A protein has these predicted regions:
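Non-ligating segments of multi-cofactor redox enzymes
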Residues: 1-211
């Protein structure tokens, strides 16, 4: 481990900058996974990170972003966070969309307006509405409608494009039905999903943003 840190000074900086987070994340993650297995939650690992709307693709973003972080500090929804290894070692500290504490406001284009390096290109609200940074993934066996036989629908209520709707399920219940093609990847559904430790609905990143 010491050899790895010696060879990678950027990682040393990350560990020094986030000592508490690094110390707590691993055991918390391990604990969550253990609890998830016990209660039947199915974990979901995202294959691709979500770069901000206007960044065109993860590759374009990684090439132009200097991790200066005005977008992170100004994000009104606190969706943009400094990345660790989501983009790989070369993208450490570059902002990534994270829906733990919020979701990307459907009409917000602030990050595209303040990026000084053209890593995030300017977007109008109308252009953002047509930009898909990621797509919705639903894990039925994690959903409380399935596990607890209770109604929910929080994800559908927060979807601005109707990519998540509720359809008849059983015993008078309704369950989410997804249409990834019209999802823009705002993360509203993932943020509000009440299931823990592993949510029933997630946003998977698009390596290249779709229009």
């Amino acid at each position: 481990m010491y050899a790895i840190l010696y060879l990678c000074p950027v990682m040393v900086a990350v560990f020094m900058a986030f000592p508490t987070a690094v110390a707590l994340t691993a055991p918390k993650s391990a604990m969550s996974q253990s609890v998830g297995v016990l209660i039947g939650n199915k974990p979901y690992k995202k294959e691709h990170p979500l770069s901000p709307p206007g960044s065109i693709s993860a590759e374009h973003f990684n090439q132009h972003c200097t991790a200066c972080h005005p977008c992170v500090s100004k994000c009104p929804s606190h969706v943009l966070k400094p990345s660790l290894l989501e983009y790989g070692v070369g993208g450490i500290l570059q902002p990534v969309m994270n829906f733990e504490n919020g979701f990307c406001n459907y009409d917000c284009t602030l990050c595209s307006e303040i990026c000084p390096n053209k890593a995030i290109l300017p977007l109008t609200k109308e252009e953002k509405h047509l930009t898909q940074v990621g797509h919705v993934v639903f894990i039925e066996e994690n959903c409380i409608v399935h596990t607890d036989n209770t109604n929910c629908g929080a994800c559908a209520e927060h979807c601005p494009t109707q990519a998540v709707t509720m359809v008849p399920y059983r015993d008078g219940l309704t369950i989410p039905k997804i249409n990834p093609d019209i999802c823009v990847g705002c993360g509203g559904c993932e943020y509000v999903c009440p299931v823990r430790p592993f949510r029933a609905i997630h946003i998977e990143g698009n390596p290249v943003h779709l229009q």
